[in-house]
Amino acid sequence: MAVQQNKKSRSRKGMRRSHDRVAVPAVVYCACGEPTAPHRACPSCGTYKGRQVTKQDNE
């Protein structure tokens, strides 16, 4: 088991962990008003860049 040789300061520990944060997911809103991921078809209406790209079952 690895054991540290010297104590790491709070500052150095914080600098090491500075890149460990969770990225906030990017959200854009479709013309229908639903949130969706950028560069992907809208899961609710099936449009992408103003075109219908997937079939949607309207029940």
Curated annotation (Swiss-Prot):
Compositional bias (Basic residues): 7-19
GO CC, one annotated term: large ribosomal subunit
Keywords of this entry: Ribonucleoprotein, Ribosomal protein
GO biological process annotation, one example: translation
Region of interest: Disordered: 1-20
Gene Ontology MF: a single term: structural constituent of ribosome
Pfam families: Ribosomal_L32p (PF01783)
InterPro entries, alphabetized: Ribosomal_bL32, Ribosomal_bL32_bact, Ribosomal_zn-bd
Top-level taxon of the source organism: Bacteria
Family membership: Belongs to the bacterial ribosomal protein bL32 family.
Name of the molecule in the record: Large ribosomal subunit protein bL32
Source species of the chain: Nitratidesulfovibrio vulgaris (strain ATCC 29579 / DSM 644 / CCUG 34227 / NCIMB 8303 / VKM B-1760 / Hildenborough) (Desulfovibrio vulgaris)
